[in-house]
């Protein structure tokens, strides 16, 4: 199995995060390998806030997760990914434990 983190908020931004992409990849994966694999996107129909809620309920240590696209030692807090992450935590009335620049 191959798992990836596409979520509902990404459908319109990234073609590889759309349900049609997942279906097509699974069709290709079934015929292209000696041992067929499946491509899984368990959060495809969940918002980022819903994903954060699931993680909080499971006790995930979000200080050990990364969202920023800038590739620095600390998250920038300004890119689209950081903004979505901060909003997801805010919608869950929880402070994001990640340290941000500035």
Regions found by a protein language model. Give the residues of each.
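Nucleotide-activated chemistry modules centered on ATP-dependent adenylation/adenylyltransferase
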Residues: 1-102
């Amino acid at each position: 199995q191959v798992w990836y983190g596409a979520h509902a908020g990404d459908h319109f931004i990234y073609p590889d995060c759309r349900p049609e992409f997942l279906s097509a990849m699974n069709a290709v994966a079934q015929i292209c390998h000696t041992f067929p694999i499946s491509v899984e996107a368990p959060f495809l129909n969940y918002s980022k806030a819903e994903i954060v809620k699931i993680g909080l309920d499971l006790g995930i240590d979000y200080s050990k997760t990364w969202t920023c696209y800038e590739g620095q030692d600390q998250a920038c807090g300004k890119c689209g990914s950081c903004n979505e992450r901060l909003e997801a935590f805010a919608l869950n009335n929880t402070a994001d434990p990640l340290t941000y620049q500035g």
